[in-house]
């Protein structure tokens, strides 16, 4: 029981950290220099809301088991949508050229997982769901819940990989822009993505799924919260400082220069635009 209380206290720390970051980002929206930055801020706010919901669920998982069974659809839904919105942020920041809307098909699989968990919540008796989560018994319900959670984990790993590939592609496309190499590198974003998967998602998954290795290491759950808090702080500070460079879409005049072959003047104007965006931020 004492271990459950300790685990709940530790799991509450990322929720509090996310709430503080959420407030800071919300207060900063009016200062955002352009529409793209505001869009990034709104996406970050969504991520922090989902993080709060998810870690609140883990607190319930530790000390309020009956409440967690009822809360399970919210916990699963938030966990499945977090990597999608993090990828959306990467998608917006790394946009080069004509800006396209974030494809809605990325939300289909998380939505399907959410529907699946809600169907279980409304059709399967409470005690049967309780046994599937806490008794580690073999049943159709436990198999569906475990499979859904595994898909959420794979989804997180997949979109982390897609984010890293997009950052790599972005770096390759902006090598000719010399306005601010440090801000264009997005090393902080790559670090958050890798750090989150290796030191947060996988250990938490091991605990929830009851993998023996993680259950033997009784205090490992203490360290899973440290990467969560650290990545939240790094993400918040870099967004607040606008530690990235938004490459503006090519204008009609620039397209005309490209057609006429005036590449030198075009390149100079593009660099000046990026420099101006940097100074204005």
Task: Name each model feature, range by range.
Residues 95-120, 145, 181-196:
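The cytoplasmic-loop to transmembrane-helix boundary for the fourth helix
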Residues 14-25, 42-62, 82, 112-120, ...:
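Hydrophobic alpha-helical transmembrane segments of multi-pass membrane proteins
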Residues 181, 193-251:
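Interfacial "cap-and-anchor" motif at the non-cytosolic start of specific transmembrane alpha-helices
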Residues 53-74, 209-214:
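Helix-loop junctions on the outward
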Residues 119-132:
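Membrane-helix interface motif
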Residues 30-41, 92-103, 172-185, 217:
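Membrane-interface helix-boundary motifs at transmembrane edges
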Residues 1-20, 149-153:
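Hydrophobic transmembrane alpha-helical segments in integral membrane proteins
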Residues 277-281:
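Conserved small/polar residues in nucleotide/adenosyl-binding loops
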């Amino acid at each position: 029981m004492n271990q459950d209380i300790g685990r709940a206290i530790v799991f509450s720390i990322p929720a509090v950290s996310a709430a503080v970051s959420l407030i800071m980002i919300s207060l900063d929206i009016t200062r955002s220099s352009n529409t793209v930055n505001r869009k990034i801020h709104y996406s970050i706010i969504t991520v922090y809301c989902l993080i709060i919901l998810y870690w609140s669920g883990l607190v319930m998982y530790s000390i309020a088991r009956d409440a967690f069974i009822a809360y399970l659809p919210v916990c699963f839904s938030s966990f499945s949508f977090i990597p999608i919105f993090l990828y959306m942020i990467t998608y917006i920041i790394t946009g080069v050229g004509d800006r396209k809307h974030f494809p809605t098909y990325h939300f289909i699989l998380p939505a399907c997982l959410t529907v699946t968990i809600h169907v279980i919540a409304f059709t399967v008796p409470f005690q049967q769901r309780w046994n599937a989560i806490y008794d580690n018994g073999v049943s159709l319900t436990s198999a569906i819940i475990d499979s859904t959670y595994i898909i959420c984990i794979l989804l997180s790993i997949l979109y982390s990989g897609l984010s890293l590939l997009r950052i790599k592609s972005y770096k390759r496309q902006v090598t000719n822009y010399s306005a601010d190499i440090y801000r264009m590198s997005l090393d902080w974003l790559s670090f958050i993505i890798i750090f989150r998967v290796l030191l947060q998602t996988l250990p938490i998954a091991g605990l929830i799924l009851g993998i023996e290795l993680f259950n033997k290491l009784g205090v490992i759950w203490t360290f899973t919260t440290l990467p969560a808090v650290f990545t939240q702080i790094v993400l918040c500070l870099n967004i607040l400082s606008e530690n990235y460079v938004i490459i503006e879409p090519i204008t009609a005049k620039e397209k005309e220069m490209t057609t006429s072959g005036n590449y030198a003047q075009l390149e100079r104007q593009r660099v000046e635009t990026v420099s101006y965006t940097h100074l204005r931020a």
